[in-house]
Amino acid sequence: MMVRPTGGLALTGKSTDEQINDYLKRWGIHQEFTYPFGKTQLWSLISRPGNLNDCHPFCKENEAFDWDGSNHIDRLEYLNGMTYIRQFLNWNEGEGYDLIIGEENGPQSYVVWQITELNDNQSSLSITVYPYLLANFNKALSFLPFVLYIRPKLRTYLKSVLRGFAYHAEHNQPVPRNYWGKHSWFS
């Protein structure tokens, strides 16, 4: 039975842009990967409903709830059973998207996926995460825990996710789970 998730942007009286600006005040982690194929193929990989089933090495199941021109919402269950809802805020056809992700009705991280065309046969995908972890802490006090613990964990995670799209494109089969090693947060 498909149950429509609740949650999303908080009802704070702020506009979507104002809430996104609040997310952008957090510490961010950026990772990028270059692919040996063009922007069109990369977009088709990252924009399909349920795409993480084939491309995400820590995904147990990725189920789309809404996936049409204006609404994109899905559920990502990790190998360890943790379940997150992804609500896409801005969908820029052929270019990328941004979304919030987190447990249903829980704290949300803000994520930006951006495609860059390098030439006809090469493109790159960058993912930038503004995690909810430490978001309510003073930036000066949260700097060391962020740099020493959270950033390395998320970088390892993002590298595996980005490489998963290349694996799927090259082998035309789902990326094996934990292919580049287990992750203590998601495996």
Residue ranges and their predicted role:
Residues 5, 10-12, 103-160, 167, ...:
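Beta-strand/loop substructures that line and gate deep hydrophobic ligand-binding cavities in soluble
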Residues 175-187:
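Charge-rich (especially acidic), low-complexity segments
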Residues 72-79, 98-104:
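Short beta-strand segments that buttress and anchor functional surface loops
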Residues 92-96, 120:
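Short, conserved beta-turn/loop elements at beta-strand boundaries and strand-helix junctions
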Residues 41-46, 52, 74, 88, ...:
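Hydrophobic pocket/interface hotspot
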Residues 28-30, 81-86, 107-112:
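Short, surface-exposed coil-to-beta transition loops
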Residues 2-67, 186-187:
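Hydrophobic ligand-binding cavity/cleft-lining segments
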Residues 25-27, 68, 80, 107, ...:
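Residue-level preference for beta-strand/loop junctions
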